Amino acid sequence: MPKLRSATSTEGRNMAGARALWRATGVKDNDFGKPIIAIANSFTQFVPGHVHLKDMGSLVADAIEEAGGIAKEFNTIAVDDGIAMGHGGMLYSLPSRELIADSVEYMVNAHCADALVCISNCDKITPGMLMAALRLNIPVVFVSGGPMEAGKTKLSDKLIKLDLVDAMVAAADSSVSDEDSAKIERSACPTCGSCSGMFTANSMNCLTEALGLSLPGNGSMLATHADRRELFLEAGRRVMALTKRYYEQDDASALPRNIASFKAFENAMALDIAMGGSSNTVLHLLAAAQEADVAFTMDDIDRMSRQVPHLCKVAPSTAKYHMEDVHRAGGVMGILGELDRAGLLHTDVPHVAADAGGNLKSVLAKYDVMQTQDDKVKQFFMAGPAGIPTTKAFSQDCRWPSLDDDRREGCIRSREFAFSQEGGLAVLSGNLADNGCIVKTAGVDESNLTFIGSARVYESQDDAVAGILGGEVVAGDVVVIRYEGPKGGPGMQEMLYPTSYLKSRGLGKACALITDGRFSGGTSGLSIGHVSPEAAAGGTIALIENGDRIEIDIPKRSIKLAVSDAELAARRETMLARGPMAWKPLSRQRYVSMALKAYAMLATSADKGAVRDRSKLED
């Protein structure tokens, strides 16, 4: 029978000092011997997705202690990608994922916690905590802060739904008046919560449901809705049930590495493809798989992208649906139900929402709105927006008049009526990206599935933005932004501003964009990121010259630089002749701090999840 990890610091005469310190935190004599459950919170006043999390740890703690555990809360950092966007702050976003993972590991291992609840929400926080949870391999439940309500405003007497990207595009569009731009800006982000579309934060919170590590509704229930309170309480109860199963019954199926198995990663990727999730999710799933010692790779993603249809289309890929609409249609469980009926889901995998001996099949039987007989579950998925600006959680209890169970023309479709029979993400490969690259096909217009254009090369995002706004980029160009990968940036910046500016200048369907950086979940258009190897690692993207012909064929999963092998070999020799300046941008002026340099020294390219190069850390 596994011994409580916390016994290391609570048992024996030699631990008198540790027990004295535990007592100073509120632990009583009769508490010693109970499991200690760490609560990793990520409250901050910097981030709308986290501004309401201050008291959530107390909710979880109450449920844990009621179930017989000792709850101890700590906090991690949280970077807002939207606020960090468009300036040097974005260099810190992806590296913060590693810091979050490390900080959770440090706190849990330093204090010998027995289990973990992760309270996350936004872009790098959920994946960072996920990496830590799989690294630690102790019982864990994830519960997020939830998505914000979609913005709404009237323009030309027409009520429209909005999100963050709409505000950015409008501000960059000279045809939009100052008055309308300001109106959109003030309406785009009305409440606390993660941004309202299928951006990175919401994508990752949905994927934790499919991995089996969070409760139904985690990815889609609005931050403002009163029903979300129960998710926090149930997370506390569930983690205690998992803790007892492992430590008292020697049930290893309660551990995250046994829950998040290869099959579970396939389920998560199937969901991601079906819902057209953010391309960043590929980066984070690959990173999490490495922490779990699961051999899930880009090849698996490529294979699945050809098999899984696009069943759910959400902003930024459409203005019609946001996360509140996904929830009304049954949330993640609704999409998983359709994947199951299409024969594209493993249902024999464990899930934290299942009782001992149960699995995803039993969870779907209860929570898939198309098969459940539970009226409470149907009411749960009818939770809707109030339309009242607020930063407070659980501040409203509005309901939709009905569920969206239209699987022909609704927000979630059956396979027969899918938005497309191929999914919302694709892996492209060719001589421009030997190890692959990623495109969010859910955001690509059908007219752009194949594209041939001339390279317009920039060695930084800043230069690309200046070029787009300055009129250098014209229809037919393929904008190439390089040296923005994990090592070359460093930090693998998001390219939301370049894609937004292309869109605002009417070039959204007339140009393509290729980068070894990454894209915000808010990106749409023919935007191809994660080019691997990156420029700083000797990738072919570093050898592209202005005017080179680039051929993109999404149906064939191909991306080609139409330059002969002999010419590429000659360019590579010229690059190597630079000596210490090889594979570095010559014209870019950028301050890189010591913290970022330390990150860059160990960073791998995107096809490896941009994680640390373990070979450099081994003895």
From Swiss-Prot:
Location of N6-carboxylysine modifications: 124
Q: Which cofactor(s) does the record list?
A: [2Fe-2S] cluster; Mg(2+)
Q: Where is Mg(2+) annotated to bind?
A: 81, 123-124, 494
Keywords for this entry? Answer: 2Fe-2S, Amino-acid biosynthesis, Branched-chain amino acid biosynthesis, Iron, Iron-sulfur, Lyase, Magnesium, Metal-binding
Catalytic activity entry: (2R)-2,3-dihydroxy-3-methylbutanoate = 3-methyl-2-oxobutanoate + H2O; (2R,3R)-2,3-dihydroxy-3-methylpentanoate = (S)-3-methyl-2-oxopentanoate + H2O
One GO biological process this protein is involved in is:
L-valine biosynthetic process
- Select a single GO molecular function from the record's annotations and give it: magnesium ion binding
Cellular-component GO terms for this entry: cytosol
User: Which EC number(s) are documented for this chain?
Assistant: 4.2.1.9
Kindly provide the name given to this protein in its UniProt entry: Dihydroxy-acid dehydratase
Its source organism is: Shewanella sp. (strain ANA-3)
